[in-house]
Amino acid sequence: MRAKWRKKRMRGLKRKRRKMRQRSK
């Protein structure tokens, strides 16, 4: 169960990072 929320959080972080990169471009 702990890995479940951890995987979801990691996915959200990756998505946010992608948006940040586009803004920097």
Swiss-Prot record:
Keywords: Cytoplasm, Ribonucleoprotein, Ribosomal protein. GO terms for biological process: translation. One of its GO terms (cellular component) is ribonucleoprotein complex. Residues 1-25 are annotated as: Disordered. Pfam families: Ribosomal_L41. GO terms for molecular function: structural constituent of ribosome. It is found in: Cytoplasm. It comes from the Eukaryota. Component of the small ribosomal subunit. The ribosome is a large ribonucleoprotein complex responsible for the synthesis of proteins in the cell. Initially thought to be part of the large ribosomal subunit. Crystal structures show eS32/eL41 to be a small ribosomal subunit forming a bridge at the interface of the 2 subunits. Component of the small ribosomal subunit. Belongs to the eukaryotic ribosomal protein eS32 family. This is Small ribosomal subunit protein eS32. It comes from Ictalurus punctatus (Channel catfish).
